[in-house]
Amino acid sequence: MSTASVIIIGAGISGISAAKVLVENGVEDVLILEATDRIGGRIHKQNFGDVPVELGAGWIAGVGGKESNPVWELASRFNLRTCFSDYTNARFNIYDRSGKIFPTGIASDSYKKAVDSAILKLKSLEAQCSGQVAEEAPSSPKTPIELAIDFILHDFEMAEVEPISTYVDFGEREFLVADERGYECLLYKMAEEFLVTSHGNILDYRLKLNQVVREVQQSRNGVVVKTEDGSVYEANYVIVSASIGVLQSDLLSFQPLLPRWKTEAIQKCDVMVYTKIFLKFPQCFWPCGPGQEFFIYAHEQRGYFTFWQHMENAYPGSNILVVTLTNEQSKRVEAQSDQETMKEAMSVLRDMFGATIPYATDILVPRWWNNRFQRGSYSNYPMISDNQLLQNIKAPVGRIFFTGEHTSEKFSGYVHGGYLAGIDTSKSLLEEMKQSLLLQPLLAFTESLTLTHQKPNNSQIYTNVKFISGTS
């Protein structure tokens, strides 16, 4: 049985940042157990059409504000190549099913209507929470352009997906990662600072890949972790950095069971599914000038192949288009073949650009929802929610601590939220370990009094000595 002071379950950005803080503060015997064959979690690069594409997190959001985004600092430090992204132009590049772009005036009016409706929705939710009735009910989008803008507004720009604090604190600019090393190189660079590496490969025994944790057993004396291949590990504490979707699934079991307040909070947190579908073409047939990186398809079904982006700014000559689907559309596409998805995407593109455009030569469809080690893309707390929900998800249970972007009070759903959450969780654990050390002399004194007032018993003496020594 392998032992450590702290076991960290998951090697995403939260797990890596948590481990780094522990090692830098003297807790060097950490053990990171990762279910897959790589570190990074939902930050994952894959080569497609001769260029690297980001299957999961792809942007550094919140740059240029009064405070410096810590992930932007890492990107600058390690010379990560990025490209500025401006979503705002997308609303003026909205195509109908006949291939015509909606006039600017109509697009502006529809966007204003959608914003006003979102504000009314927020006020209505606030009124419900306070037991009042809203003065005016928000309108629902009905036409294809209204549905498209509603999708863009809520799935890309508003607080239901993006915590406003990201933009208030760190700034409103967003940068697309376009580096051959991938976004994940930031994690490898972080790992190099506390793990043994060689030529970009992590060789340190404290990182164990392909270790699927299935059971976490907690007792007064420590925590035992069991994996799918039968391996058993023991530690004084455990940090669980699995995603909220994994916590909601049956992949991880806890003994004893987590308390009801914990499990109820975990189940109440929404999980967003965000799917970027990549299409490779023999040549470029879409507009590529200034302000045309993003474009929108207006359809009668909300979110149906709505949001498009070309990769020419990031990788000139790549001839790659990306279409983003979310939630139910994502789950629908994950359940069908890539060929069927390509057929649907081509039908949409021919609506916008005509029947003579070339057929895609390749397609890449990530499946975050059906990945049992991820079960979704990121957490999504309700626009109006009790802060107690997040606090309960975040709170430790005995020797088991929890981290991840879903435990970030201000930046849930973001890479920097996960990064900061790992740091915060390790700081809390270090404080817990410090308090435990301070209590040891008192516990030893209490146990010694117990020994002097009880009839000697070999097994009892052994138990007390074992507990006092701190070896259990």
UniProtKB/Swiss-Prot annotation:
Q: Does the keyword Flavoprotein apply?
A: yes
Reaction(s) catalysed by this chain, per the record, are: spermine + O2 + H2O = 3-aminopropanal + spermidine + H2O2; N(1)-acetylspermine + O2 + H2O = 3-acetamidopropanal + spermidine + H2O2; norspermine + O2 + H2O = norspermidine + 3-aminopropanal + H2O2; thermospermine + O2 + H2O = 3-aminopropanal + spermidine + H2O2
Top EC class, one word: oxidoreductase
If researchers knock out this gene, what phenotype do they report? No visible phenotype of seedlings under normal growth conditions. The double mutants pao1 and pao5 exhibit enhanced tolerance to salt and drought stress.
Q: How is its activity regulated?
A: Inhibited by guazatine, N-prenylagmatine and 1,12-diaminododecane.
Please state how the activity of this protein depends on pH. Optimum pH is 8.0.
Q: Chief location of this protein?
A: cytoplasm
One GO biological process term: spermine catabolic process
Give the cofactors, semicolon-separated: FAD
Q: Which keywords fit this entry according to its UniProt record?
A: Cytoplasm, FAD, Flavoprotein, Oxidoreductase, Stress response
Q: What is its EC number?
A: 1.5.3.16, 1.5.3.17
Tissues expressed in: Expressed at very low levels in leaves, stems and inflorescences.
Q: Which GO MF terms does the UniProt record name?
A: flavin adenine dinucleotide binding; N(1)-acetylpolyamine oxidase (3-acetamidopropanal-forming) activity; polyamine oxidase activity; spermine oxidase activity; thermospermine oxidase activity
Return the GO cellular component terms, semicolon-separated: cytoplasm
Q: How is the cofactor bound?
A: Binds 1 FAD per subunit.
One Pfam family linked to the record: Amino_oxidase
Subcellular location field: Cytoplasm
Binding site residues for FAD:
E34, R42, V213, E405
Task: Specify the pathway.
Answer: Amine and polyamine degradation; spermine degradation
Top-level taxon in the UniProt lineage: Eukaryota
Briefly, what is this protein's role? Flavoenzyme involved in polyamine back-conversion. Catalyzes the oxidation of the secondary amino group of polyamines, such as spermine and its acetyl derivatives. Substrate preference is thermospermine > norspermine > spermine > N(1)-acetylspermine. No activity detected when putrescine, spermidine or N(1)-acetylspermidine are used as substrates. Plays an important role in the regulation of polyamine intracellular concentration. Involved in the production of hydrogen peroxide in response to salt and cold stresses.
Family (UniProt)? Belongs to the flavin monoamine oxidase family.
Protein name per Swiss-Prot or TrEMBL:
Polyamine oxidase 1
Organism of derivation: Arabidopsis thaliana (Mouse-ear cress)
The gene name reads PAO1
